[in-house]
A protein has these predicted regions:
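Phosphate-binding/switch region of NTP-binding enzymes
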Residues: 145-198
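Conserved inter-motif catalytic segment of the P-loop NTP-binding fold
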Residues: 50-115
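Short, charged/polar "capping" segments at the starts of alpha-helices
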Residues: 37, 62-68, 150-153, 738-740
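C-terminal regions of RecA-like/P-loop NTPase motor modules
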Residues: 2-3, 185-222
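Glycine-rich P-loop/Walker A and Walker A-like loops and their local beta1-loop-alpha1 context
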Residues: 6-62
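Conserved mixed alpha/beta core segments that line enzyme active sites in large multi-domain catalysts
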Residues: 148, 264-265, 270-310, 365-763, ...
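Substrate-engagement module of ASCE P-loop NTPases
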Residues: 116-117, 122-149
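A conserved helix-loop-beta module that forms one wall/lid of the active-site cleft
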Residues: 276-342, 348-368
Length: 847
C-alpha cells in the first residue's frame, strides 16, 4: 500500500525512536532471554487491546506463555512443531488466511523450534514464507530469536525479509534497544542504542557511552548450525559406555531417521550411535533421509548382525549419499513457490494446481551453498554412474510402499564436470517434480495420505555393476519377496520366497516390459518352471538388456545378442543355457545344428550359492521385520565365480497372506461359470462375493485405434471411481497397466484400484497375453491393495464370455459419460456370484 497507518508499540518513547509501527510490519527481537522479549510484548499487547485490535497469540514454545486469552478479541492458537515444518507452516498459513486483514500477532520465540526441527535453515524458511503473507494482510507481528543460538546466515535471511530487526539487551538491569533495520523510516538517531525507562527512550549518542555499553556486551562469533552442534555432541558421546549412548542415539535418530514408531523402534534395535553418525556424515543438507534410504541401510545392518558373518564378505559395500528433506523445502521456499504449494495442498488445488507446481519444480535454482555441496558429492563419485532415487518420508514404511510412484533417475555421469553437474541437478529436479505426478497424487489420495507430511529426501547411490566395453551394467538385478504370493503348484513352499531376475539393469525387473519376460525363481526349488507350455521357454525369457551407454551418456536398451558380445568379466554359462528345444526344431527343419541359447540363469542357480544366499537373506529380513519383505538387489560375479550381492532397497510387503482353506463348490457343468478350472492366480484362498463385472471385449477392443484404446482406459477409470465401495471384477484382454495398447489396456493403477478382482484374458491371434510381472511395481500395487488376480488362459481355465455379454449392459447407469463405449465395455450386475480359489488344488472359479 502507498500509505500505511501508524500504530503504537505501547511505549511512547520507543514509538519516537522508530517513528511508530506501520501496518504490515514484522518485528523481530534478538534477545538474551524470553523474559526480556516479554518486556516488549506486554505493552504491545496492552495497546492492541486498548485499540480494540484482533490479537492472535501463536503458541508453540516450551517457555512460559506470553499472552492469555483474557477477552473476546484475543485468540490463542496452539500449533505442534513435532509434526514437522510443512504441517506447522501450513497451519500457521491457514490461520493467517482465516484471520484476514489487520490482525495483530505475537509468536513464541522461534528458537524454541530448534529442538524439533534441528535446523536453522528451516526456521529461516518458516520466517521467509510467513512474513510476506503477514505483510500482505496489513498485520503486525512480533517474533523473537535468542541471541547466539542462530547462524549468521539465518540472521541475514531474517534481516532481508523482516521490516524491523532490533537487538534487545539487559545491562545492569536496564533495558536497551538497538534498531538494526527499520524499513522505510529514518531519523538521525534511529540506529543508535536506546535506554528504555517506562515510556521514555533515551538515545545513547555519546561515543563514550556507546563504547562503554557495547564493551560490556559479549559478542559471539558465528555459531554452528544446531544440526552440526547436535552431531558434535553425539560424537563426544561415543566415548561413553554403550548404555549411556542410547539417549543421544534416540535424539540423533529423530533428526536423521524419523519414520513411524514401528520402523523407528526397529532401527533403534539394530543401529548403534556410531551407525547413525556414519549416516549423518554422508548427508547433504539436513533433515530426514527418507524411507527408501532407511530401508536399504536397515536391511544391510540386519544381515551384518544376524547373519553370523556369512553375509559380510558377500554383500557389496555401499557409499551412498543422502539429500535431506530440508533441501526439498528450501528449494521450494527459496524459489518463491510456497504460496503455490500452500494452495496446491487445499482440496480445490490438489489436482488443479499440481501441473503448475510440477513445471516450476523442473525449472528452479538451488541456493549456492547447496550447489557447492552437490559439487563436492559429484567430485567424490567421479565419473562412476550414479542413480538419483526418491526417498520420501512415507516410502517403504509399514503400510505404504509407494512402489514406482516417484522417479528414480540414472546419471551416466560422463563428460566435463559442468556437464555432469547439470545432469545431476536435472535428475534431482525430476525426482522433486514427480511428487506432483498424477500417479503419486492418486496414490496419496486413495491411501488417505493427503494430509500427511510427505517430505522428499533423495538417495544417491553408485550404480552397481561394471564397465563392459562402452556399456555399464550389473550381471544380475531383480526383486525378491520373502513370501511367495503367486503359487501355481501345490508343492511350492510359500515361505521360501521368490525372485524375479533380469540380466543388466533392474529396470526390467520392476517395469512391465513390452515383449519381454523376467526369470521367476521359486527359492524352494530354483529350477521349477512357472506355468507355461513346453517349448515356450524361449518365448517367456528375457530378450533385451537395459544398460548405461557410456559413449552416449544415457540409459539404453540393447538386444541380448549385442550384450553377450561384450567381455562380461564372468562365466557366460552362469546366465546362458543351450536352448535344446529350438536346436531340435532347427534340426527337424534341416537347418543344421546352429547353437541357440536361452537366458535362464541355470548356472547361477545350480553352481553358485546365490539362491541359498537369497533365501537365507529374505528369511533373516522378514524375521527381523516381523513381516514379509520385498527387496531390490543386484548381483555381480567375477571370472572365478566370486559373488557379491548389493541390497538396494527393502520394505515391508503389504499382504493379507494366503488365508484359510476354501471349500470350492462342485461344478456339474463348466458352462455355468464365468470361468472355471486350474489357473494362475494370486491372492491366496478366497471367497469373494461380486456385485458387478466390468468386461472389456477383446475383439471390439482390438478393432480400435491407439487413441481410442487410451480412451477406453480413461473410461474404466471413471467406472472405477463410480464403483468405489462395490465388489467388482474387472476382466480384459492381455495386460492391465501396460504402457503399450497392443498388449492390453493402458490404464494407471489408480484407474482400477477399487476393483476386488482383476482378470487378464488370453486372446488367440490378437497378441493379448496375460503376464502378472511378479515383483513389478504393478504387482506391488495389487498386493498392497489386496486385489485378487487371475490369468484366464484356456484350456486349463475355461472362460465363458456369454455369461457376461448375454446380460444387460448397465454402463450408462453407472457412468453416463461412458455410454458411447458400450460396444467395448460391458458392465453387468451379478448378484449371488462369487470368485473362489484354493491354493492346494490350484482351482479357481467364478460362478
Amino acid at each position: 500500500m502507498a500509505t500505511r497507518d501508524r500504530v503504537s508499540t505501547g511505549s511512547s518513547g520507543f514509538d519516537k525512536v522508530i517513528d511508530g509501527l506501520r501496518l504490515g510490519d514484522n518485528v523481530v527481537w534478538q534477545v538474551d532471554s524470553v523474559a526480556d522479549y516479554r518486556e516488549m510484548v506486554d505493552p504491545y499487547v496492552a495497546q492492541a487491546r486498548a485499540d480494540g485490535r484482533r490479537l492472535v497469540y501463536v503458541r508453540f514454545g516450551s517457555h512460559e506463555r506470553l499472552v492469555t486469552a483474557d477477552d473476546a478479541q484475543t485468540v490463542v492458537f496452539e500449533v505442534d512443531p513435532t509434526h514437522g515444518f510443512e504441517t506447522f507452516a501450513m497451519q500457521v498459513h491457514n490461520l493467517v488466511e482465516q484471520e484476514g486483514i489487520g490482525a495483530f500477532y505475537v509468536f513464541d520465540c522461534l528458537t524454541d523450534l530448534l529442538p524439533y526441527w534441528h535446523s536453522d535453515l528451516m526456521i529461516g524458511n518458516f520466517f521467509k514464507v510467513t512474513c510476506p503473507f503477514l505483510y500482505e494482510l496489513d498485520t503486525i507481528a512480533y517474533f523473537a530469536i535468542v541471541r547466539g543460538e542462530h547462524t549468521y546466515a539465518t540472521i541475514a535471511g531474517i534481516r532481508e525479509t523482516t521490516q524491523l530487526l532490533l537487538d534487545l539487551y539487559r545491562v545492569d538491569d536496564q533495558i536497551y534497544i538497538h534498531p538494526l533495520k527499520v524499513w522505510q523510516r529514518y531519523s538521525p538517531t534511529m540506529f543508535f542504542p536506546n535506554l528504555v525507562r517506562g515510556d521514555e527512550a533515551i538515545s545513547i549518542t555519546s561515543s563514550t557511552e556507546v563504547a562503554e555499553l557495547f564493551s560490556s556486551i559479549e559478542r559471539q562469533s558465528d555459531r554452528l548450525d544446531h544440526w552440526n552442534v547436535a552431531l558434535d555432541r553425539a560424537r563426544e558421546a561415543l566415548a561413553l559406555p554403550l548404555r549411556d549412548q542410547e539417549a543421544v542415539k534416540a535424539s540423533l535418530m529423530r533428526m536423521v531417521i524419523g519414520g513411524s514408531a514401528r520402523m523407528f523402534d526397529l532401527c533403534a534395535d539394530y543401529f548403534t550411535l556410531a551407525d547413525v553418525l556414519a549416516i549423518a556424515s554422508r548427508e547433504v543438507g539436513s533433515g530426514l533421509i527418507g524411507g527408501k534410504s532407511v530401508g536399504m541401510l536397515l536391511a544391510r545392518r540386519i544381515l551384518e548382525r544376524d547373519g553370523d558373518a556369512r553375509f559380510t564378505s558377500l554383500i557389496e559395500p555401499h557409499d551412498s549419499y543422502y539429500i535431506g528433506t530440508d533441501v526439498f523445502y528450501t528449494y521450494i521456499v527459496q524459489n518463491g513457490w510456497w504460496p503455490l504449494r500452500a494452495k496446491q495442498r487445499t482440496a480445490d488445488g490438489y489436482y488443479t494446481l499440481a501441473p503448475e507446481l510440477r513445471e516450476k519444480l523442473l525449472a528452479g535454482r538451488f541456493p549456492n551453498d547447496l550447489r557447492e555441496q552437490f559439487m563436492e558429492m559429484l567430485e567424490y563419485f567421479g565419473q562412476s554412474p550414479i542413480i538419483v532415487r526418491s526417498s520420501s518420508l512415507l516410502e517403504d514404511d509399514f503400510g505404504n510402499a509407494f512402489a514406482g510412484k516417484y522417479e528414480s533417475v540414472f546419471c551416466v555421469n560422463q563428460g566435463s564436470p559442468e556437464e555432469r553437474y547439470r545432469g545431476f541437478e536435472d535428475a534431482l529436479r525430476l525426482v522433486y517434480a514427480s511428487t506432483m505426478s498424477e500417479e503419486a497424487l492418486d496414490y496419496r489420495m486413495n491411501r488417505g495420505l493427503v494430509d500427511r507430511d510427505e517430505q522428499m529426501a533423495i538417495l544417491v547411490q553408485r550404480v552397481s555393476g561394471d564397465q563392459h566395453d562402452e556399456d555399464y551394467f550389473p550381471h544380475v538385478a531383480g526383486v525378491g519377496n520373502s513370501s511367495n504370493l503367486y503359487i501355481w503348484d501345490p508343492e511350492v513352499d510359500a515361505d521360501a520366497g521368490m525372485l524375479r531376475l533380469v540380466f543388466g539393469l533392474g529396470t526390467r525387473a520392476v517395469d512391465r516390459t513390452v515383449g519381454d519376460y523376467a526369470k521367476i525363481v521359486c527359492l524352494d526349488d530354483p529350477l521349477r518352471l512357472p506355468p507355461m507350455a513346453y517349448g515356450e521357454a524361449k518365448k517367456y525369457s528375457q530378450r533385451g538388456v537395459d544398460v548405461l551407454s557410456l559413449a552416449q551418456n544415457t540409459w539404453h536398451s540393447r538386444t541380448l545378442e549385442e550384450v553377450m558380445r561384450h567381455d562380461l568379466k564372468a562365466d557366460r554359462s552362469l546366465f546362458l543355457s543351450l536352448d535344446e528345444h529350438t536346436a531340435t526344431r532347427q534340426r527337424e527343419r534341416g537347418r543344421g545344428a546352429t547353437s541357440s541359447y536361452l537366458l535362464d540363469f541355470r548356472g547361477l542357480l545350480t553352481r553358485t550359492e546365490f539362491p541359498a544366499l537369497m533365501r537365507d537373506a529374505l528369511t533373516l529380513l522378514s524375521t527381523a521385520y516381523g513381516h514379509p519383505v520385498d527387496i531390490e538387489f543386484t548381483a555381480n560375479l567375477s571370472v572365478d565365480n566370486e559373488l557379491r550381492v548389493n541390497i538396494l532397497q527393502c520394505r515391508p510387503l503389504q499382504t493379507r497372506g494366503i488365508g484359510a482353506p476354501v471349500s470350492l463348490p462342485p461344478i456339474e457343468d463348466v458352462r455355468d461359470c464365468v470361468f472355471c478350472g486350474t489357473g494362475n492366480f494370486m491372492g491366496g484362498n478366497v471367497r469373494i462375493p461380486l456385485e458387478r463385472i466390468v468386461y472389456v471385449r477383446p475383439g471390439e477392443y482390438l478393432a480400435l485405434g491407439e487413441q481410442d484404446r487410451h480412451a477406453v482406459a480413461r473410461h474404466i477409470g471413471r467406472l472405477n471411481a463410480a464403483l468405489k465401495g462395490s465388489s467388482t471384477m474387472l476382466i480384459g484382454p492381455g495386460r492391465w497397466g501396460t504402457t503399450t495398447p497392443a498388449l492390453g489396456v493402458p490404464l494407471r493403477f489408480a484407474e482400477l484400484c477399487n476393483m476386488a478382482v482383476i482378470g487378464e484374458v488370453a486372446s488367440v491371434g490378437s497378441g493379448f497375453s496375460p503376464e502378472l510381472s511378479y515383483g513389478s511395481h504393478f504387482f506391488q500395487d495389487l498386493v498392497e491393495s489386496g486385489i485378487f488376480y487371475v490369468a484366464i488362459v484356456e484350456p486349463n481355465l475355461r472362460f465363458n464370455e456369454g455369461r457376461i455379454v448375454d446380460l444387460p449392459n448397465v454402463i450408462a447407469d453407472v457412468s453416463p459419460e461412458s455410454a458411447h463405449l458400450a460396444h467395448v465395455i460391458h458392465v453387468v450386475e451379478v448378484p449371488g456370484t462369487e470368485v473362489c480359489s484354493d491354493i492346494t488344488s490350484q482351482r479357481v472359479l467364478c460362478r
